[in-house]
Design a protein with these regions (language model features):
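C-terminal motif of bacterial Sec signal peptides marking the signal peptidase cleavage site
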Residues: 22-26
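Extended ligand-binding regions for polar small-molecule ligands
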Residues: 28, 54-57, 121-172, 228-237, ...
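Acidic, polar ligand-binding/catalytic clefts
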Residues: 28-45, 95-126, 133, 236, ...
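Second-shell loop/turn segments in exported
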Residues: 88, 129-132, 145, 216-224
Length: 297
């Protein structure tokens, strides 16, 4: 072996050692966490690492702050994993979601924010959720009177029941749900509704049909949650049978546009951007946006 070969090998060895040192350093470097437990106003989030779900108003609202480190994840299960692992300090969610998450995990809590006061700047359309139908569909005109007939008291009572159910999804609630239709006639066909089935308390998957859960098409699992019960009520009032389809968030609107589903009931806000793609009913629920965080040890 000549000197040149030895020199090349030596240089290569040094480079490998340097890469190893840098890699080791980056692996052992820890992110400085921010304690959110004493924060009562959104201004207190400065410098924190906060996440939101991709493609949602939550992410838009978060990006508008400008003083936080923003991360995004494709669904709420990944947001929860990131929070528990310490990758983020908190994430944006509707208050019912926060209530559900906290009820299931005592190590978590949330910042009680109020829209346009201590919290995010948002309109009712931004934080409300509505049913989406294909552009030009006559279903909006049919469903709006049904939604209008659901009182604010019934909506709140149903959400309280749903949050309780979400803490133990396969356990019977032991009481009649606040929103139930008396119509059992399904002669008007089938209503195909898409949702994530992964966004408690609005929609989730469970192993049994407890508490009026609906079998997910093409799956052995059942869907339940606020969206499911609203979908059941709307379908019943229309005299239709209900089918639930589990669909990833980014595929919901394309699937509706393609005619794969009749509607979307998935905790979806009727933002101006989405209104260019689909038609929305009036909102069937409104909520504050809050921040879920992990309690300090």
């Amino acid at each position: 072996m000549n000197r040149r070969s030895i020199t090349i090998i030596s240089i290569t060895a040094v480079i490998c050692i340097l890469i190893s040192i840098v890699t080791l350093g980056s692996c052992t470097e820890k992110r400085e966490k921010v304690d959110l437990s004493s924060i009562t106003n959104i201004s207190g989030l400065a410098g924190a690492t906060i996440a939101a779900q991709t493609g949602t108003f939550h992410l838009d609202a978060l990006n508008s702050l400008g003083n936080v480190n923003v991360k995004e994840y494709e669904d709420f299960s990944k947001l929860l994993v990131a929070l528990k692992s310490g990758a983020i300090d908190g994430y944006v969610a509707e208050e019912p979601t926060a209530l559900s998450v906290v009820a299931m995990d005592p190590t978590l809590d949330y910042i009680h924010l109020v829209n346009n006061q201590t919290g995010f700047t948002a309109t009712d359309a931004d934080t409300g959720i509505a049913v989406a139908f294909k552009t030009g569909s006559d279903m909006v005109a049919k469903v709006n009177p049904i939604i209008a007939g659901i009182s604010a008291e019934t909506r709140s009572a149903l959400m309280a029941q749903i949050v309780t159910m979400s803490a133990n999804t396969d356990k019977a609630l032991g009481e009649t749900l606040a929103l139930v239709s008396s119509n059992t006639n399904t002669s008007n066909g089938t209503l195909k509704i898409a949702m994530e089935c992964n966004y408690a308390p609005f929609n989730w998957s469970q192993t049994t049909d407890a508490n009026g859960a609906v079998r997910i098409q093409g799956s052995s699992l059942y869907a339940n949650g606020y969206d499911v019960q609203v979908a059941k009520y709307i379908a019943a009032e229309l005299g239709m049978a209900l089918e639930i389809y589990a669909v990833e968030w980014d595929s919901l609107i394309p699937g509706l546009q393609a005619g794969t589903y009749d509607g979307i009931i998935a905790g979806m806000s009727p933002t101006s951007e989405r209104e260019e793609q689909v038609d929305f009913t009036d909102c069937y629920y409104n909520s504050n946006l809050v921040i879920i965080y992990k309690k300090a040890n």
